[in-house]
Amino acid sequence: MEIGGVPVVTLSSGRGMPILGMGTAENNLQGSERVKLAILKAIEVGYRHFDTAFVYQTEGSLGEAVAEALQNGLIKSRDELFITSKLWCADAYPDHVLPALQNSLRNLKLEYLDLYLIHWPVSLKPGKFVHPIPKDEIFPIDYKSVWAAMEKCQMLGLTKSIGVSNFSCKKLHYLMATANIPPAVNQVEMNPIWQQQKLRDYCKTNNIMVTAYSPLGAKGTMWGSSGVMDSEVLNQISQVRGKSVAQVSLRWVYEQGASLLVKSFNEERMKENLKIFDWELSPEDLKNISELPQRRVSTGDPFVSINGPFKSVEELWDDEV
């Protein structure tokens, strides 16, 4: 099945998700007219999957864009869109999950989400978001009770599917040991220079869809890397294929069986990022990409604390670094 030329994958929840979506996270972006206009343009050129989070402060802008798209006739029904948001760590407590989701729905002016994710496998001191995160306010997450609250949200119809983000194989195993509804998605960093083979294999075995964030390495962000866009191997492949480096990287992610999130507010790049489904990488291309040096860029360092549940980046990712 396709929507506007974008393949749709069926999640373990039985719900369809466009395999390519638009992300809305950016340094100091917050909600703005610029974000709303970019989302409207994305809908116009064919995007139907949008990813936000409470902590991004873009839920309001996305909600305004959806309302305008309906009003302007860009879409006929909200059901044409797939919208994801995320539970922030300060709300990762069993009695906070439902109110947090309801707050996101108010921000978005929607009756339901298509997907709600636990943003990180950690809890923070409840209350207002503070940046940087105080190192003495990082606590272990209670996987069982928080996930049970997520399951309740799905059973109430406030979200059609539930999942996680930034979970290692070990943390997924913890969660699934007591889950009644398995996570439909694990959203993680994934690109040619951080390929996540072990995690992808685990998720495939357990029918969890991997969604790749930063498929181009998040170049230009505070924490991102130019490693993907500057890769000599990817540049050589792009020249031979007559595609951009971005298209080669996105196509590689897609060919690994993952869904992916892209973020550009430039109309031409938005269109370019959609043009990855009618061609293929060669076996030689795939072999060369598989041999690229690997490096995690999104380390999760803000959640590492000598007094917290994760005393090192290695502990946070269970040595999947």
Swiss-Prot record:
Specify which residues bind substrate according to the UniProt entry for this protein: H119
Residues where NADP(+) binds: 214-273
EC number(s): the record gives 1.1.1.-
Give the chief site where it resides: cytoplasm
Subcellular location(s): the record lists: Cytoplasm, Cytosol
Keyword Cell membrane among UniProt keywords:
no
Keyword vocabulary terms for this entry: Cytoplasm, NADP, Oxidoreductase
CDD domains associated with the record: AKR_AKR4A_4B (cd19124)
Report a single Gene Ontology molecular function. oxidoreductase activity, acting on the CH-OH group of donors, NAD or NADP as acceptor
Q: What is this protein called?
A: Non-functional NADPH-dependent codeinone reductase 2
Q: Could you tell me which species this protein originates from?
A: Papaver somniferum
Its taxonomic path starts at:
Eukaryota, Viridiplantae, Streptophyta, Embryophyta, Tracheophyta
